[in-house]
């Protein structure tokens, strides 16, 4: 799968789940379960409830995603 196939969307973290998973509400109102990308995990970037994040979704499963950026 090419990297360009992923969909990036903005959202807000609503809930923290076990194993570094988060429930994120996207700007269009959809709810997504997302995990932290490897670079964010490696650099110890903390994500809290209420943070604005960028979520990367694949076109195959739009209910799961990867958090790739935390806005300030």
From Swiss-Prot:
GO cellular component, one term: cytosol
Localisation: Cytoplasm
InterPro entries in the record: NA-bd_OB-fold, RNA-binding_domain_S1_IF1, S1_domain, TIF_IF1
Family matches, as SMART domains: S1
Disulfide bridge positions per record: none
Record bears the keyword Secreted: no
Residues covered by the S1-like domain: 1-72
Domain of life of the organism encoding this protein: Bacteria
Subunit structure comment from the entry: Component of the 30S ribosomal translation pre-initiation complex which assembles on the 30S ribosome in the order IF-2 and IF-3, IF-1 and N-formylmethionyl-tRNA(fMet); mRNA recruitment can occur at any time during PIC assembly.
Annotated family: Belongs to the IF-1 family.
Protein name from the UniProt record: Translation initiation factor IF-1
């Amino acid at each position: 799968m090419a990297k360009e196939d992923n969909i990036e969307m903005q959202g807000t973290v609503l809930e923290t789940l076990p194993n570094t998973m988060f429930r994120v509400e996207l700007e269009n109102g959809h709810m997504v379960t997302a995990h932290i990308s490897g670079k964010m995990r490696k650099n110890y970037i903390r994500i809290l409830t209420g943070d604005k994040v960028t979520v990367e979704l694949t076109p195959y499963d739009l209910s799961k995603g990867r958090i790739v950026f935390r806005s300030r």
